[in-house]
Amino acid sequence: MVQPVFDAAVLSGRADIPSQFIWPEGESPTPDAAEELHVPLIDIGGMLSGDPRATAEVTRLVGEACERHGFFQVVNHGIDAELLADAHRCVDAFFTMPLPEKQRALRRPGESCGYASSFTGRFASKLPWKETLSFRSCPSDPALVVDYIVATLGEDHRRLGEVYARYCSEMSRLSLEIMEVLGESLGVGRAHYRRFFEGNDSIMRLNYYPPCQRPMETLGTGPHCDPTSLTILHQDNVGGLQVHTEGRWRSIRPRADAFVVNIGDTFMALSNGRYKSCLHRAVVNSKVPRKSLAFFLCPEMDKVVAPPGTLVDAANPRAYPDFTWRSLLDFTQKHYRADMKTLEVFSSWIVQQQQGQLLPPLASH
C-alpha cells in the first residue's frame, strides 16, 4: 500500500508545508477573496407544503440564480436539525481516527469512493489540503451505505453508516424536489428531471480540511466545476467555500440552517447550456479544522445525458454530445483532473472517440 503524503495529525502543526501542496502565485488565495457573495437565500417551506404562489416565487429565484452563476441557498428544507448534527459529529469521529484505521477504506486508483488524503499517485503537484471519505448512495439499495461502511471500517462503525444512510435518503428527497423546480424554471415541466433522477446513483462525500500554518500558499480544494449534476452542501460554521464570479473570488458565508446548492456539469448538459456550472474552490485557515457534507446527485450510470428537445432549436443548437454519467465519471477519475474546462474537454474527447481519432494524453491536467 502506498502511504499518502498527507497525514493531518503531523502536517497541521508544521510551520512549513511540503512543496506538493504549494499552489503557484495567481492560483493561491488572496486576502481580497474574503468579500462575500450574496447568493439568493430561498425559503422552500411553502413550496414543500404545496403553496402555488410560494412555488412560483421559488421557481423564479432558482432560475435567475442558475442562469447567473448556478449557486443558491435553501432554508426551511425539511431536513431534521438533529440528523444534521449527527452527520457532523460523525465527520469528527471518522477523521480524528488514527490514519491506519482510516486507511481501511482507502480509495483505490481510478475509483471515486473511499478514503483519500491526497491525490498522490495520480498527481504530484497542487495537492489539496484535505481528507475525504466518499461512498455511493442509491435509493434502490437502502442498505448500500451501511454495508459499505461496515465492510470497510468494521462493525464498530455501523452507527456511522446508519446516520449517513438516513442523511443520503433525505438528500435524495431534497434533490428531487429541486429537480422539479429546475424543470419548471426551464419550461420542460416539473416531472421531466425528477423522473430522470428518481433512480439516482449518487455520491456522498465527507470533507475535512485540517488547519494549515501557511493557508495563503495552498488550497483545500482547487478551482473546479463539479462534474456531477447537482451538489447540496452543508458547511460547518468555519467558512471556506469561494465562488469565482464577475472576475473574482468571493466567499459564501455559512448558515447552520441552510444548504448551499449548485449546478454541476452534467446538469449543464441536461439544460443544453442554459444553466451554468460555476468555478469554485475551498480555502483553509491556520486555526481550526473545517468540515462540510457534500451530496452529489448523479443519474444512473448508463442513463444517456441529453437535453429535452424543447431546449434545442435553430437558435439554441446542441451544446454537448450525448454521454453517460459512467463515461464522464471514468474520464474524471482516470484521465482528467476536474477543473473549469472538464465538460468542454470531455465533449471534445467524446467526438474524437466517435471519429476514431487517436486520443491525446491527458495526464498533465
Curated annotation (Swiss-Prot):
The protein's name in its UniProt record: Gibberellin 20 oxidase 1-B
Record-listed Fe cation binding positions: 224, 226, 280
SUPFAM superfamilies: Clavaminate synthase-like
InterPro entries: DIOX_N (IPR026992), IPNS-like_FE2OG_OXY (IPR044861), IPNS-like_sf (IPR027443), Iron_ascorbate_oxido_reductase (IPR050231), Oxoglu/Fe-dep_dioxygenase_dom (IPR005123)
One of the GO biological process terms: flower development
Family classification: Belongs to the iron/ascorbate-dependent oxidoreductase family. GA20OX subfamily.
Taxonomy of the source species: Eukaryota, Viridiplantae, Streptophyta, Embryophyta, Tracheophyta
Residue ranges constituting the Fe2OG dioxygenase domain according to the UniProt record: 199-299
PROSITE patterns xref list: FE2OG_OXY
Tissue localization of expression: Not detected in nodes and the ear of the elongating stem.
EC numbers for this chain: 1.14.11.-
Recorded superkingdom: Eukaryota
Catalytic activity of the protein: gibberellin A12 + 2 2-oxoglutarate + 3 O2 + H(+) = gibberellin A9 + 2 succinate + 3 CO2 + 2 H2O; gibberellin A53 + 2 2-oxoglutarate + 3 O2 + H(+) = gibberellin A20 + 2 succinate + 3 CO2 + 2 H2O
Alphabetical list of Pfam families matching this protein: 2OG-FeII_Oxy (PF03171), DIOX_N (PF14226)
Broad EC category: oxidoreductase
Additional free-text comment from the UniProt record: The expression of this protein encoded by the B genome of the hexaploid wheat is much lower than the one of the two homologous proteins encoded by the A and D genomes.
Cofactor dependence: Fe cation; L-ascorbate
GO molecular function: gibberellin 20-oxidase activity; metal ion binding
Catalytic residue list: 290
Keywords, ordered alphabetically: Iron, Metal-binding, Oxidoreductase
